[in-house]
Design a protein with these regions (language model features):
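A glycosyltransferase accessory/donor-loop signature
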Residues: 1-26, 33, 37, 186-312
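Active-site-proximal specificity loops/subdomain of glycosyltransferases
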Residues: 71-114
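Histidine-anchored nucleotide/phosphate-binding helix
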Residues: 31-45, 329-334
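Short aromatic/hydrophobic "clamp" motif used to bind/position activated sugar donors
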Residues: 123
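Short loop->beta transition adjacent to catalytic acidic/histidine clusters or analogous donor-positioning motifs
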Residues: 44-53, 78
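Conserved donor-nucleotide/metal-binding helix-loop-beta segment in metal-dependent transferases, i.e.
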Residues: 130-163
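Hydrophobic, well-ordered beta-alpha structural blocks that scaffold small-molecule cofactor pockets
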Residues: 294-419
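Short internal beta-strands
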Residues: 50-57, 151-152, 341-347
Length: 419
């Protein structure tokens, strides 16, 4: 107890750090992912933190109570804002927009100025699928831009493996300035000058249906010119770090962003999965017995999925795509029967993907019914192919499901734990 008192005194001697998360939890399982992020935030700072949770009616009272318990155990503050109750008309319009790629919570960060207390002058926004492997006060002490915003450029966050964005292709935003909206810092007095950014931004999306990252494209439309470019350590994409040419052997002091379902908890050798799970087990959501049962269920699901994949591959012309220098070696070292398969090199160099090679191959070989097995940068290629109308599971698959037989989506596993 004495140690906890000393820790509390130390916290009270520092400035308050304000951090915000947005949660839409229709299934009841997403709260668990945010809990791991919060645990990493608490564990890695001695600062006094107030967490502001923007949520709606999908956040259950049980999960809210667990968040409160988690914060109190760390001597921190947590405040909840029910957006359905505070801004019912705006939230109704967001939920009626029928964008199934992103949850309504993605837009809640555009409404901060309407719900935060006036004494909050600066705030960090964090996506729920992040692990804070540094002291959050370091980010809080960074400057913001002339327009009151600080963020990491997407090209840097993805180590130059980002998918093209239409808002950049049409010249509205310079590609090198386009930033990620998953980790942001706002000077709230300046951000408050844009009270209608959410609804006005939704009108922009209506005029440009090709803009497929709603909140991110809106924020870039308004702020890409004069925001402060944060160092990449404040928004580092885990999927990019797993690429053979970028892979790091040790964890760094940074904020890891598990965007694109990058959590694969049953791949135990992966340092980023280990990092996430090390924090998750400390949360009030973790139950060891339930977890072990879920892993067993997950393994059976993986086995069943392999059978489905093999049926999809039957009587198809198989095309592996990836980096000739690294992925081809992985393929040759695997036990997969590659007889008759084509390998499509889609890398100009170790950091540059030529997405057009995938698209051109499909167009030129339609009659041969090709099945593309993507060996690296799958989230990026998946997004690009889906935008062109190709179907995951029919036209292309993630080859890692064949090369590694112990994987299952981390979010799927967490859903199983929630049963």
């Amino acid at each position: 107890m004495g140690e906890n008192i000393l820790k509390e005194i130390k916290k009270c001697s520092t400035n308050m750090v304000h951090v915000c998360y947005a949660i839409y939890d229709k299934t009841g399982s997403f709260s668990r992912i945010a809990a791991a992020s919060l645990q990493s935030l608490y564990d890695n700072t001695d600062a006094w933190v107030t967490v502001h949770i923007l949520h709606d009616n999908t956040l259950s009272e049980e999960n809210k109570e667990k968040y409160i318990y988690q914060a109190r155990m760390q001597g921190q503050n947590i405040v909840f804002y029910n957006m359905d109750e505070l801004l019912p008309d705006v939230i109704a319009k967001i939920k009626a927009s029928d964008n199934d790629r992103f949850s309504p919570a993605a837009m809640y960060r555009l409404l901060l100025m309407h719900v935060l207390p006036k004494n909050v002058k600066k705030i960090i926004y964090l996506d729920c699928d992040t692990i804070i492997n540094l002291d959050i006060e370091k980010l809080y002490n960074e400057p913001v831009g002339e327009n009151g915003v600080a963020a990491v450029a997407e090209l840097e966050a993805t180590f130059y493996h980002a998918v093209e964005k239409e808002i950049c292709n049409n010249g509205t935003v310079k590609r090198e300035n386009y930033f990620c909206s998953g980790i942001l810092m706002f000077d709230t007095e300046k951000y408050n000058n844009y009270p209608d950014i959410c609804l006005d931004g939704m009108e922009i999306l209506k005029k440009h249906p090709e803009y497929d990252c709603p909140d991110q494209d809106i924020l870039n439309y308004y702020f890409a010119d004069k925001y402060y470019h944060l160092p990449v350590k404040y928004d580092t994409f885990v999927d990019a770090l797993r690429l053979p040419e970028i892979k790091q052997d040790e964890l760094q002091e940074c904020i890891y962003h598990y965007a694109g379902n990058a959590m694969e908890l049953t791949k135990s050798e992966d340092i980023y999965n280990q990092l996430f799970f090390n924090y998750y087990v400390k949360t009030p959501w973790f139950d060891g017995n339930v977890f072990l049962k879920a892993v067993s269920v997950a393994m059976k699901a993986r086995h069943d999925a392999d059978k489905v994949i093999m049926n999809i591959m039957k009587d198809r012309n198989i095309v592996f795509c990836g980096n000739k220098e690294t992925d081809l070696q992985r393929l040759q070292a695997s036990k997969i029967n590659c007889n008759g398969a084509v390998f499509l090199n889609i890398y100009a160099d170790k950091n540059t993907i030529i997405m057009e090679k995938c698209l051109d191959y499909f167009e030129q070989n339609k009659k041969d019914r090709p099945l593309l097995l993507v060996m690296s940068a799958y989230p990026l290629i998946n997004q690009a192919l889906a935008q062109k109308g190709y179907k995951e599971g029919t036209d292309y698959l993630d080859a890692s499901t064949l090369l590694i037989h112990d994987g299952i989506s981390g979010r799927d596993l967490l859903k199983m734990i929630n049963l």
